[in-house]
């Protein structure tokens, strides 16, 4: 199963002047998804990575409206309603990586507007435990958003990833377990990914400059392949034990 993940660069989804550029970028990725029969697509197309300024108040509402317009255009122009693509999962990022859509609650407002603008319950919110843990919302507040997403048919892919370090899942300080459990209890959990970043990846130097915690070696003597395998085993055991406890069927 292939999942396509898209990013935007060189143009801002919240800037009306960049609308056509952003739509063209996303439509190009969606064309590839349709060509190869991809059923689930994802993107971080709320805003550009590590660019721009925080939008608050009326400016935030305008940003919500603009990203909704952009994604509704893509939905129509790429003819997603009659395609193999079954859902589009939007991922928010922590403060610093994003400036505006930096929590599950803020991102949910945008996803809700996307569905309203497209006239279809097509867009979902991807919830990454790492970005939730690095946001300004606590665990109960994120659990409440997860339930609201589920109630509205907008619960997307779950990323099992450790906050701040983005390394070994054992450094998550309880966020993965709590939010994965909240997902499972909705009865609408469908996709879970394990995500681990290399603490010396040259492409992620900007993250290490943003937060030195991202540069910590959490491997404990393992290769990164071994860390990913350990993460998959850990999450699999959690899911299997949700079944044993009657939380999942």
Named regions from a protein language model:
Residues 1-2, 85, 155:
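A broad structural signal for short, well-ordered beta-strand segments within beta-sheet-rich domains
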């Amino acid at each position: 199963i292939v999942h396509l993940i898209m990013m935007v660069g060189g143009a801002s989804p919240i800037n009306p002047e960049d609308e056509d550029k952003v739509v063209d970028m996303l439509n190009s990725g969606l064309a590839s998804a349709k060509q190869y029969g991809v059923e689930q697509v994802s993107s971080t197309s709320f805003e550009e990575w590590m660019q721009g300024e925080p939008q608050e108040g009326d400016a935030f509402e305008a940003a919500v409206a603009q990203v909704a317009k952009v994604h509704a255009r893509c939905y129509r122009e790429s003819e997603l309603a009659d395609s193999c693509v079954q859902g589009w999962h939007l991922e928010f990022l922590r403060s610093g990586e994003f400036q505006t859509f930096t929590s599950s609650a803020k991102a949910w407002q945008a996803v809700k507007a996307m569905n309203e603008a497209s006239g279809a319950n097509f867009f979902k919110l991807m919830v990454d435990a790492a970005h939730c843990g690095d946001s300004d919302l606590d665990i109960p507040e994120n659990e409440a958003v997860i339930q609201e997403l589920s109630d509205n048919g907008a619960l997307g892919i779950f990323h099992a990833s450790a906050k701040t370090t983005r390394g070994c899942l054992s450094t998550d300080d309880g966020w993965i377990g709590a939010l994965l459990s909240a997902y499972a209890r909705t009865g609408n959990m469908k996709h879970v990914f394990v995500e681990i970043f290399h603490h010396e990846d040259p492409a992620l130097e900007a993250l290490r400059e943003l937060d030195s915690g991202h540069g910590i070696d959490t491997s404990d003597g393992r290769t990164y392949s071994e860390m990913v395998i350990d993460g998959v085993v850990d999450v699999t055991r959690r899911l299997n034990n949700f079944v044993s406890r009657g939380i999942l069927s």
